[in-house]
């Protein structure tokens, strides 16, 4: 009885020690993430959008850690050629982890070629970007990196583009293949009502949670959690130019409408966390 008691004490002690270590590691990652977000190296126009994009809350929800291998899918966008989230992820992962940028295939269009060139220039000369490993997400998608090697794959506001190109499920599949068992697939996307048809989603630039979860499950993912961090109840999803009416694009037919769309703010977005099962 005495030996059993000693054994239980030892087990409890080791469990507490492990829990304390994991908590300490989490605190270190949280501090490093806050430091990256508050860095003066970030582009001023990007920082102004923090109130809409909620980077600390979003990346914490995805449970990112500074020693992870993370793939960011097609990080550049029209008004964020150097990658809005990349400016946070690159310095955060630079020392102990790895950021892989699965960028555009430059042969697919002149616009994609220019976007990739701008991004690669930043990788070449910027001290925060120079440890980024470049990869490619083509249409149709091919292997992103070595199978079962990444801890996390992240995509921010890209799903509507892949849906329009006809390769959304295929992007999910190559993301699944790249992840280790237990790896996390983090998705942020303009959220369509579930009654939107595929044609509506392609035209308006919003994708439904229902379709996203369905396709992710079809390639093997399990939905672990969802969050309303990036929700915006002011967004009716009924705009003449779709999601592009809203900031930051503000594609308006009449300048007098700008204030109306600025008042709405950036889109209502789903924030979904999937995992690749361990077995």
Predicted regions and their residues:
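Short glycine-dipeptide loop
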Residues: 67, 95-96, 179-185
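A short acidic, Gly/Pro-enriched loop at the edge of an enzyme's catalytic core
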Residues: 143-153
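Conserved beta-strand signature within the Rossmann-like core of class I S-adenosyl-L-methionine
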Residues: 99-102, 182-190
